[in-house]
Regions:
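Duplex nucleic acid-engaging cores and interfaces of nucleic-acid transaction enzymes
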Residues: 1-145
Length: 145
């Protein structure tokens, strides 16, 4: 199944960042599980704000490309924006390869365990910047985290 069809716009928001990288953000707890556990491939990068509710975010690694630090920071900033830390200044965001994201049996939707975490500190983008990165198929802008 190709990723174009696996990312239902009702379940995730899609962005494109410089370098042609695609970034997906889950909309609800159940959508976060879908993005993190069904859409994600092992080499993708996974992001979530540390200790604060928010979206699970994926930086899609197409054709085994390696994102540079700037791409990782931009995806982390998208995770910061889609969290309750949106207005919190400098935000710590956990980042790891999707292969290190697992779900324990019986845990609630949106709850995952991660290994091999890297923490990036980023400022959430302004809403105008988020609109510029938004992919056309998902143009209906939603202000909720």
């Amino acid at each position: 199944m190709n990723r174009e069809k696996r990312c239902d716009p009702r379940r995730c928001i899609e962005y494109e960042i410089p370098g042609g990288w695609r970034v997906l953000a889950g909309k609800t707890d159940a959508d976060n599980d879908f993005v993190s556990l069904k859409v994600a491939k092992p080499r993708d990068w996974w992001f979530h704000v540390r200790g604060i509710p928010g979206s699970h975010v994926l930086l899609l690694a197409e054709h085994d490309q390696e994102p540079d630090r700037e791409a990782l920071k931009r995806a982390a900033a998208i995770a910061a924006y889609h969290s309750k830390a949106r207005t919190g200044g400098l935000v710590p965001v956990s980042c790891t390869r999707a292969q290190y994201v697992t779900k324990a049996r019986g845990t609630k939707a949106g709850s995952v365990q991660i290994r091999k975490e890297i923490v990036l500190k980023v400022h959430p983008p302004a809403p105008e910047q988020m609109m510029e990165m938004r992919v056309a198929a998902n143009q209906q802008f939603d202000e909720s985290p």
